[in-house]
From Swiss-Prot:
Belongs to the RpoE family. It comes from Streptococcus thermophilus (strain ATCC BAA-491 / LMD-9). Residues 14-83 form the HTH HARE-type domain. GO terms for cellular component: DNA-directed RNA polymerase complex. This is Probable DNA-directed RNA polymerase subunit delta. Residues 119-133, 143-191 have a biased composition (Acidic residues). Pfam families: HARE-HTH (PF05066). HAMAP family: RNApol_bact_RpoE.
Length: 191
């Protein structure tokens, strides 16, 4: 592939962003490209090795996002911003999102390398309540099904233990005032 824009220039002096812009311009409007295809064409044009491209890839992707002349169109497709009017950009993005919403969602299966088919091992990833298929454990279900009589019995036993410490009759006779507490504190600090 030859790009007329760079006629007479050294390929080694060209940046990947310049080449990407030129490739998209020569393809024309409505010929957006997947990121991988764009990188492959840049690599072929610049005649760079896989190692060189791999090392430059993070910087190229950052430049592609920050350069105002490129626009992501979803599904890792890229185009030139000049191809789209502002209103058309919003519509284009919305239509791509609408298409994605209608597509069935595929749930990623979690893989735990430490499980190794051991049935006795505990999989802590299965108890996330935010998962769509979460079912509460039996302990939670048992708690919800507790009898109220059991709870009342616990409260009564707790009250009886408190009555052993301070009988109910004595509670009415005791009056606390803040002054009494302060005086005791002052006496202790002066000693």
């Amino acid at each position: 592939m030859e790009l007329d824009v760079f006629a007479g220039q050294e390929k080694s002096e060209l940046s990947m962003i310049e080449v990407a812009r030129a490739i998209l311009e020569t393809r024309g409007r409505d010929k957006e490209m997947y990121f991988n295809d764009l990188v492959n064409e840049i690599q072929n044009y610049l005649e760079k090795s896989d190692a060189d491209i791999r090392s430059a890839l993070p910087f190229f992707y950052s430049d592609l996002n920050t350069d105002g002349s490129f626009i992501p169109l979803g599904d890792n497709k890229w185009g030139l911003r000049s191809w789209y009017a502002i209103d058309e950009i919003d519509e284009e993005v919305i239509t791509l999102e609408d298409i994605d919403e209608n597509a069935p969602k595929r749930k990623n299966k979690k893989v735990n390398a430490f499980m190794d088919g051991d049935e006795d091992a505990i999989d802590y990833n299965d108890d996330d309540p935010e998962d769509e298929n979460f079912t509460p454990s039996s302990a939670i279900l048992e708690y919800d099904n507790d009898n109220e009589d059991d709870e009342n019995a616990e409260v009564e036993s707790y009250d009886s233990e408190l009555n052993e410490i301070i009988p109910d009759d004595d509670l009415d006779d005791v009056e606390l005032s803040e002054e009494d507490d302060d005086d005791d504190y002052e006496d202790e600090t002066n000693d």
